[in-house]
Every structure is written in C-alpha cells, then in structure tokens.
C-alpha cells in the first residue's frame, strides 16, 4: 500500500501521515485551518505548509480573541512579514473571520458544533481509488460555503470549504490504497486516545 500520491515530499508527507483527514474538534485548530485554507487560495498547499509556523507566530497562535482585536498597526506588521502570504485581502479576511468566528461560537457554544453540523457530526468515509475521483466540492461544502458567507466569512468558497473538510477529517479522502484510509476511519478526534474507557 502506498500513501496518497500528492504526498511525495516534505512537508506534505508529514502532514499527510499525521494530520490530514484526522477529525478535528478543537476550536482553535479549526480556526487555524480556516485561516490557512483561505490563505492558500490561488497558491499551493505546500507553500502554506512551509509558512505555517510563521503564520502561527504572526497571528498570535491563531487565537481568534486576539486576532479579532487587530487594528491598522497589526495589518501593517503583517503586510511587512515575509514569512506569510502578504496579501491585504487575505489578511483583512483573517481578521474579519476571527470576529465572525467568535460570533458563531457564541451562537452555537463551539465553532466545532457549527462546522460539524454540515456532516451531521460524523466524518464521511469516502472510498476513492484514484485522485481523479476525489471531488473539489460537494453538496456539503456548497452548503457550508453559503452559510459561512451569509454570516460574513471571507475566502470561504466551496472548494476552500471542501479542502477544510478534508484537512479537519470531516471527510476521509485518503485513497483506499493508502494505509492512512483505514487508520483515519478508526480515529475519533485529534488528540483523543483510542483506548476504550472502563
């Protein structure tokens, strides 16, 4: 068995083997992926992975409460930071999305509860055999995109939403020929022990 064909070099291999497709229910990590997927628009995911640590540092560990308070000085600082994608619209979107994220979390109790409602709270287990079979968007990502945009989120088109769903384990899009497919299908959530409780 071989890993998914897009994971041929670092940092993609480590990301594929340790994170991609593992269900995420931690609000901060969901917010991180929301921002990173939006930053990736028009770029390769490899580019974003290589800048991920820089993003964490530049965006205060992806703490939405802090980012939501960013002002003009922070925007200027971020535009001058070569370690991230220095796109004014994407930076403004990250700040605006932090504010909207907090509003959604207040309404639903957690961002996790809101986001996972688009897949009825459990991962969709796909059984793709070829990368050509994996869709770029689905009815669920279309619905997520519409609702996120209605609430004021930016850089959340359906293709970005589907990438977010893949990254956070809302869908298991590892090919069935990849050993991670079976591993991920048995994982409950990122960071949770798989041991049974007595």
Predicted regions and their residues:
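HhH-family (HhH-GPD) DNA N-glycosylase catalytic core used in base-excision repair
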Residues: 1-198
